[in-house]
Amino acid sequence: WDSNQSILYALLSCISFSILLYFTFLTIYKFISKIQFSSVLLEITGKARLKLWGYIFLCFFILWFPYFIITNPGLAGNDGMHQINELFYQKTFDGYFTLTNHHPLFTTLIQGGLIKLGLILFHSINSGVLINSIFLNILTISCFSFLILTIIDFYGNKLGLLTMMFFGLFPIFPLWANALDKTGYFNAILSLFLVSIINIDGGKRNKSSIALLIISGVLLGLIRNDGLIYILAVLIGSLTLKKKRNILISLASVVFLIVIIGKILVFSTKALPTEPMESLAIPMQQISRVVKYNPSSLTNSEKTTLNKFFHYSNMAKVYNPEFADPAKINSRWPYRQFVGTYKARKEKYDNQNFVKNKKKFLLTWIKIGENNKKLYFEAFVGENLFYIYPQNHPTIYFWMPGTSTNTLFVTKMFKNYKLNRPELFSKLVKNILIATNLPVLNLLFISFTWFFIWLIESLVIINTNKLQYLNLVFLGAAIIIVELLSPLSGYLRYSFPLIELVPILGLICFVKIKN
């Protein structure tokens, strides 16, 4: 990115590789589109169903128990600590954390309640983190067991077993089931949401399926701030369903409930809204690139305007093509300076330039872009390339939860937090890091892989006229859009929902269900 020659080389190599990928894609597609298995729809009910669910739960427990021991009492990374520090208004070196919806308020309250329980019963932050890990493990294993049971219903025991082994052995799922973080909760609830969609698309539209759709959908939207996008995508994709009225009404109700419950939570807890910069990763990156590589194109008026939103003198220095957080942190947003009553905090929030003058920022962004289209395009590509380009870019600590060494988050509440077996966790990290660099195996840890597979599966589903499953295809598209709007390039954590969805789409592609 440092010179026109380098950019030209990068573009030519990208085009060449894209042509190669295109023909590879066509070859793979032509081969796999001819693959078809058949499956008989099973009706497992009563005690037999409960017993089978118990066996699946036990298998997951055995596969995931080593992670529970290694990570005991649980992995508290930056995001999890951030949420708890906000809930308990902890002091740090540059001010005070205050409750916001930056990380979903719903998960902040759940995790905070479990931490509080540990503090009350055992007077220990480690106990609180352990209680969260136990609860999240039980929740995740229960939900994934339900998903496998549903797969067995439609696709048989063998494919159910294979899917279970994938989820059981892929380290991201057990690791995040032991994390003080919203992501583990999202993984669990997404599996329940997938259960409801599989049942509905497969013709099982009884009251329990509709109820599960509504409950899991609402939880999905509350656990992640982008969850609403996923629900809307499924709603649009469900327009192709036959006898869709009840499904569309249910999904519309989910959207309504997410918005209403979210507002109630913010109002009742007196939490501040998410800072506006969270949704401005690409504009911030594009402007920062112009400041670094073509500052002469900016007028004095534009520089003055930018200086009201950012520390202008630092913009070029902190710019990172693949990571938007430095640009966000360089803003003039008064992090950890919102103190006092809710009225005082909200008044200070409303008086920030990114809130009261957001329109002016967006107009300035558009105006600067008119003279810097090339730099804007480069910034967009740099911010998103590794989601749609097959380069080994796993960077393990970018997607794996872990103990934080960041003194900003290690407040008085977390000063005594520690892993019981840090040496075992270090060995685990080292071994996973080795796996992310082994040929073929490393493909599992590259975001592009899951995008590529989703693309093939989606085309097979469309071309074989299985349009009742288009809502799941749209769900995958929404996940990719969220990836492209995220502040990191190739960050595998944003691909977790796609990793969960891809095996389901694979079954839909290649298995014909017989009643």
PLM features per residue range, with description:
Residues 60-63, 163-171, 217-221:
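Short helix- or helix-capping micro-motifs
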Residues 78, 175-185, 223:
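Short acidic/glycine- and proline-prone juxtamembrane loop motifs at membrane-interface regions
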Residues 271-418:
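Membrane-proximal stem/loop segments at transmembrane-domain junctions that anchor or position
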Residues 71-85, 95-114, 122-127, 497:
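Extracytoplasmic catalytic/substrate-binding loops of multi-pass membrane glycan-assembly enzymes
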Residues 127, 131, 368, 378-473:
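Membrane-interface anchor segments at the N-terminal boundary of transmembrane helices
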Residues 53-55, 144-169, 187-188:
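Transmembrane-helix signature of polytopic, membrane-embedded enzymes
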Residues 9-11, 101, 105-109, 119-145:
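Loop-to-helix entry region of an early transmembrane alpha helix in multi-pass inner-membrane enzymes
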Residues 19, 23, 131-155, 192:
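Transmembrane-helix motifs of polytopic, lipid-linked glycan transferases
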